A protein has these predicted regions:
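Active-site "gating" loop of Rossmann-like NAD(P)-dependent oxidoreductase/epimerase domains
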Residues: 1-13, 34, 53, 63-66
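A short acidic, glycine-rich active-site loop
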Residues: 10-18, 72-76
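Active-site Tyr-X1-5-Lys
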Residues: 13-42
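Substrate-positioning beta->alpha
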Residues: 24, 56-57, 73-95, 101
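NAD(P)-dependent short-chain dehydrogenase/reductase
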Residues: 39-42, 46-79
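Mid/C-terminal beta-alpha module of Rossmann-like enzyme folds, strongest
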Residues: 89-155
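Active-site loop of classical SDR/Rossmann-like NAD(P)-dependent oxidoreductases
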Residues: 112, 156-166
Length: 166
């Protein structure tokens, strides 16, 4: 489904804390805009890539792909945007004086398999070739949730499972 700046938030029923808190913050900001308490715009970036983000969540798997040590890929997709493009949009949005607007910062839609294949090709290694079924990913997410509940960390949690299969 193609989304634009007027598209409603449709994943609240999944209980994805990361997405829900970003959405709730945007609602609070736009409520204040509509009450003429502040001037603001919203920038909704897709998955941002650029220098300095190698320790960010999903980057661990991508680094393993680049090293030829990750044979798996999930069934989901991702939209990627470079950090420089997001910064440019922020500057343009600030200068636009269009109070209360929302802007989507995005690039190309790719499957995660396509993303991993591109990473492997650039690194000169074999791309992942084993598709992980959703059931396996969600099972790993539940195990990760359980480990988090006792103060440890699993490979993924339920939020990661959802986002890697969307």
């Amino acid at each position: 489904q193609i989304l634009d700046e007027s598209s409603p938030y449709k994943v609240a029923h999944l209980g994805l804390g990361y997405f829900d808190t970003k959405h709730d913050a945007e609602v609070a900001v736009f409520d204040a805009v509509h009450r003429n308490e502040i001037e603001a715009v919203a920038i909704n970036p897709s998955t941002i890539y650029g220098p300095g983000d190698a320790k960010k969540g999903s980057r661990g798997a991508q680094l393993k792909v680049a090293r030829g040590k990750f044979p798996f890929y999930p069934p989901g997709g991702v939209n990627v945007v470079h950090v420089d493009d997001v910064v440019d949009l922020c500057i343009k949005a600030f200068r636009s004086n269009k109070n209360g607007e929302r802007y989507i910062a995005c690039g190309e839609n790719l499957t995660i398999h396509e993303t991993f294949t591109r990473i492997a090709k650039l690194a000169g290694v074999k791309p992942p070739s084993i598709a992980l079924p959703r059931s396996v990913i969600f099972g790993l997410g539940k195990i990760g949730d359980l480990l988090e509940s006792v103060g440890s960390k699993g490979p993924i949690n339920s939020d990661n499972a959802w986002t890697s299969t969307m």
